[in-house]
Amino acid sequence: DCIPGGENCDVFRPYRCCSGYCILLLCA
């Protein structure tokens, strides 16, 4: 799980949190 803003996502890559998942770049 992750929280909006990407705090729990991979900080070394451009991942963002979307609907509880970390995805690359923007939410579709």
From Swiss-Prot:
GO cellular component: extracellular region
Keywords: Calcium channel impairing toxin, Disulfide bond, Gamma-carboxyglutamic acid, Hydroxylation, Ion channel impairing toxin, Knottin, Neurotoxin, Secreted, Toxin, Voltage-gated calcium channel impairing toxin, Voltage-gated sodium channel impairing toxin
Modification type 4-hydroxyproline: residues: 4, 14
Membrane-spanning residues: none
Location of 4-carboxyglutamate modifications: 7
Disulfide bonds: 2-18, 9-22, 17-27
GO molecular function: calcium channel regulator activity; sodium channel regulator activity; toxin activity
Stated name of the protein: Conotoxin de7b
Recorded domain comment: The presence of a 'disulfide through disulfide knot' structurally defines this protein as a knottin.
Localization (cell): Secreted
Function statement: May inhibit sodium (Nav) or calcium channels (Cav).
Organism (species): Conasprella delessertii
Entry superkingdom: Eukaryota
Tissue: Expressed by the venom duct.
